[in-house]
């Protein structure tokens, strides 16, 4: 649902800093329509419960994190500029795994029309209160409720880290491809593993008991999966963590453009 916290909004890390699995309403993978989700896969239900529980601490930790992350701001700004160059001012984008809405608000300030989606109802409630002029909804990124081609772009900013199976990653990428218009952009940010792909369990985050798995990615593998889902990868970037600002993990980013016809995962 959300992103992951710590001094940064991301979510993963050894013990825990915060993380989430964002997304939108349901459609595939047996996720019932969310205004009141009747059923979620067990691990997604744990993500939801965990982020509902940690909402207050998480918001306190990440609400101003972008002010300390110049490269993240630069990438989000480049994303916003390219989407609007392609589709015009006010183009519609999705922030999947939006958490308390601070990244959505940053994009909106750059001229985009943003819909934030998160698995946690508590996070969506808080995002709506903090940013009443923006649109937020509860949902899962592996089963988006949006119509085909609904958005001109989407971001998953440190929000796919709770998708611990390759099948879920492919389902989310398939949903992004379905809901992004042709030639629209996808920007994904993740934590990278020191020795490739790895998953870490956390039972505490920001002093709150949780039950979460955080995935650390191999960037080349992720870029390959994004390409296989029907996107043309335009940029890959790796950065070291900002000392004293965020969890001390290496960060990876993929910027890709939607091409081709949709093929279900």
Label the model's feature ranges.
Residues 244-265:
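Core SAM-dependent methyltransferase catalytic element
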Residues 231-242:
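Conserved S-adenosyl-L-methionine
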Residues 214-229:
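Short alpha-helix
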Residues 30, 34-88, 185-213:
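Conserved class I S-adenosyl-L-methionine
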Residues 155-156:
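A conserved beta-strand element that flanks and buttresses the S-adenosyl-L-methionine
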Residues 170-182:
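A short glycine-rich, Lys/Arg-flanked "PGG" loop and its adjoining helix->strand segment in the class I
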